A protein has these predicted regions:
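Hydrophobic packing within well-folded, soluble alpha/beta domains
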Residues: 28, 32-35, 86, 95
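Short aromatic/hydrophobic contact patches that present stacked aromatics
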Residues: 22-24, 67, 94
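Short glycine-centered, acidic/aromatic-flanked micro-motifs in structured strand/loop junctions
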Residues: 70
Length: 140
């Protein structure tokens, strides 16, 4: 089962107008030629959900936002569970995504879990497979 790869405990760059932390989800369903997080993409992660929740508890009153990034956070089985944990602690949630798991995104949006989405448009259709190593353009 995929886990979280790592946590950046403090950032003022990754979530506009927020003091935030970044939860880096292991794994990705693409293999982009320009990926700068290949270690995250190729990992199964080593941080359990309970450890992430413990971190969130310790950051209440210190942060006002959490960023889910990766890899591809929406491909991870922990995504919705951790999004609910983030919102239950009254943090704003930003999601960095390649947009290929639209049903998961719809569910999260429907539950009011996501406050900000950064959608990474990888390439036009004719270049998509060559750049991403995937056939996910139509899903995007």
């Amino acid at each position: 089962m995929h886990k979280v790869f790592s946590i950046t405990p403090f950032t003022t760059l990754d979530y506009p107008d927020k003091v935030a932390a970044v939860v880096w989800f292991a794994g990705c369903n693409m293999r982009c030629v320009y990926c700068y997080n290949i270690e995250v993409v190729n990992s199964n992660g080593n941080i359990e959900m309970a450890e992430v929740c413990n971190f969130l508890d310790r950051r209440i009153g210190k942060l006002n936002g959490i960023v889910f990034s990766g890899g591809e956070c929406t491909a991870n089985p922990l995504f919705l569970k951790l999004a609910r944990e983030v919102k239950s602690r009254n943090f704003c949630l930003k999601v960095d995504t390649n947009g290929s798991h639209i049903e998961i995104l719809k569910e999260a949006i429907g539950e009011g879990l996501i406050d900000y989405i950064a959608l990474d448009f990888k390439a036009p259709k004719e270049k998509f497979t060559g750049i991403t190593g995937s056939n996910l353009y139509e899903k995007f």
